[in-house]
Design a protein with these regions (language model features):
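Beta-strand-rich ligand-recognition modules
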Residues: 334, 443, 449-458, 466-556
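A contiguous, surface-exposed recognition patch within enzymatic or periplasmic domains that forms
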Residues: 149-255
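Short, acidic Ser/Thr/Gly-rich low-complexity loop/linker segments typical of extracellular
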Residues: 321-336
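A short, amphipathic beta-strand motif
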Residues: 297-309, 335-337, 376
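A short, solvent-exposed beta-strand micro-motif common in secreted/extracellular proteins
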Residues: 335, 345-355
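Extended, loop-rich substrate-binding clefts of extracytoplasmic carbohydrate-active enzymes
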Residues: 80-131, 143-145
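Short, ordered, surface-exposed loop/turn motifs in non-cytosolic proteins
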Residues: 299-301, 307-325
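Structured interaction patches on ligand/partner-binding surfaces of diverse proteins
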Residues: 355-381
Length: 556
């Protein structure tokens, strides 16, 4: 029989072996820092904190639905100068709730009046899926802004990046470096909606991006240019545009926009699987998001082909009504096109040659259906007309004219631009020598010199002036030699700034004037002078004076 000391010794041995075993077991379950964290959420009186189970942890304020923290790999990238990421400039007191619809999804819902904002996290992803439901105009909603700490990202060498030391040039949102005369603005993204899938910024080790939605409830169509990103030494902003009023020609649409995705990476680009045209959305169907329509409730339009397309031009097919908008590119070879995931309804379908509408019709989309269109022949391309002479191309843009390709990147006062003066000699000059814009206070009265043979000079001619937009009622009143046209009416255009905010696109419009034979010189060696004068009933100065953007000028 063991004595007491032997029993104590045996007991100590058992305890020691048990302690070693427990230590071994604990060490086996210690999660290394590189492994995934726990997916889930916590809450306190101020925030909901969501851990995505990857490298992203974010917080949403319970008072107003702001994103108050964006922690990626242990560093918080959200906000600056007490400003968070949010709808518009931030909502007031809101009803903010959190739920976990499934083991792999966490959703925060923000209700502010008739507006609803959703933040959705999926297990194991460094992404936040966002949705915005707009019921009416009772809440001002133009954009979602992701605000990032400027100290964590570089000031990029782009036209929408600048330093706070630069001088204000126009309206507190356009700036100039007085040492170079270069201009910068949040407006100068140089990018149409149809030409980008995401926007963002990277410091080489971390990238933060907004992958845009399909913009079906936004406005402006495929060629709309608006805010995408701006970054300075004091602020970094990424935007998803919901309805922006600057240079807007379209109706405001209501309903659900999204998902748009805030994606964090290790410095590289976001996954193409997140792009609006690629994203798989069946997992969203069961979340109960207001206004969500899954793929089974959507339809498709396909066109067999398009005839009378011109080489060297891109053709885009757009669809729009008061409820939604879509677009797709047509095949360069035969004009085949297909537009998918469309909400049911009747749409105006427009075929654009570059950005000029050359064909329109109505088409009806049904849920789960495909509308097949037979081959379409373009009949409304003005370049098909016989002309005496033509300056530029009928394509809905001023890009071929002097300074035209730079107007989406800088202000018209930028020192890098060529002179806004420049007359034109038919048969000698190139379109690139003729200014893309005519400002009443800057370069009014441009002259086009042309000769006519005796047969041409003996008859009336039609002068056509196509514009892509105008500012404060600007329109051209032409004169030929001693003849002057009647006062033309102003075209329907946006009521905001246009030519100075990185876009030339308003409403394409063509003015047509009958020039009598008596206006022309009878001596065929004499030059006729077409003078282009911008007129308006409104006043402005310099580059904010009445103005027009030129698409094409021709004499038939």
């Amino acid at each position: 029989m063991k004595n007491e000391s032997q029993l104590k010794s045996s007991k100590r041995g058992v305890l020691l072996r048990l302690a070693r075993f427990m230590a071994l077991m604990i060490s086996a379950f210690i999660i290394p820092s590189s492994a995934l964290a726990d997916f889930g959420y916590t809450e306190d009186s101020t925030n909901y904190t969501i851990d995505t189970g990857a490298n992203l942890v974010f917080k949403v304020k319970r008072s107003n639905g702001d994103i108050s923290s964006l922690i990626y790999n242990g560093t918080d990238y959200n906000g600056y100068t007490n400003k968070n990421s949010h709808v518009e400039t931030g909502l007031g007191q809101s009803d903010v709730t959190i739920s976990q619809p499934s083991s792999s999804v966490i959703m925060v819902k923000v209700v502010y009046g008739t507006l609803e904002q959703y933040y959705v996290a999926r297990k194991g992803e460094n992404n936040i899926y966002m949705f915005t439901y707009i019921a009416d105009d009772s809440v001002t909603v133009t954009r979602y802004i992701v605000r990032l700490k400027p100290s964590l990202f570089p000031v990029l060498n782009t036209s929408n990046s600048w330093y706070s030391s630069y001088s204000t040039l126009e309206a507190k949102d356009i700036f100039t470096d007085t040492s170079t005369g270069y201009t910068y603005s949040k407006h100068y993204s140089d990018t149409r909606v149809m030409d980008y899938n995401y926007t963002g910024i990277s410091n080489g080790n971390v990238g933060a991006y907004i992958v845009r939605s399909n913009h079906e409830k936004a406005s402006g169509g495929p060629f709309y240019r608006s805010l995408i990103r701006d970054n300075t030494d004091v602020a970094v902003n990424l935007y998803e545009i919901l309805y922006y009023g600057m240079a807007q020609t379209d109706v405001k649409r209501y309903g659900l926009q999204g998902p748009y995705v805030l994606a964090f990476t290790d410095g590289g680009e976001p996954s193409s699987k997140l792009y609006a045209g690629n994203l798989k959305t069946d997992w969203i169907d069961s979340l109960g998001i207001h206004g969500w329509v899954g793929s089974s409730g959507r339809g498709r339009v396909a066109g067999v082909g398009i005839k009378n397309m011109k080489s060297d031009y891109e053709y885009v097919v757009g669809f729009s009504n008061d409820e939604a908008q879509y677009w797709t590119k047509a095949s360069d070879s035969n004009g085949y096109f297909s537009c998918t995931n469309m909400l049911p309804g009747t749409y105006t379908m427009t075929i654009y040659k570059n950005e000029l509408a050359v064909y329109t019709t109505d088409v009806t989309v049904t849920a789960g259906g495909t509308k097949i269109l037979n081959s379409i022949t373009i009949t409304d391309d003005p370049s098909d007309n016989d002309v005496t002479w033509r300056i530029g191309d009928w394509d809905g843009t001023p890009l071929e004219f002097k300074n035209g390709s730079l107007m989406t990147k800088m202000h018209p006062a930028d020192s890098r631009l060529e002179s806004w003066k420049g007359n034109y000699i038919v048969g000698t000059s190139d379109a690139s020598s003729f200014p893309c814009y005519i400002f009443k206070d800057v370069n009014n009265g441009l002259i086009v010199y042309f000769r006519l043979n005796s047969e041409q000079a003996a008859k009336n001619h039609t002068l056509k002036i196509g514009i892509t937009g105008s500012y404060i009622g600007g329109r051209i009143q032409p004169s030929v030699n001693s003849w002057t046209s009647k006062l033309p009416s102003a075209s329907n255009q946006p009521g905001t700034r246009l030519m100075t905010i990185g876009t030339y696109r308003g409403n394409n419009y063509t003015y047509s004037f009958t020039v009598p034979a008596s206006a022309f010189n009878t001596n065929t060696r004499d030059w006729n002078q077409l003078k282009l004068n911008v007129i308006s009933g409104s006043n402005g100065s310099d580059y904010l004076s009445p103005a027009v953007s030129i698409d094409c000028i021709e004499l038939e």
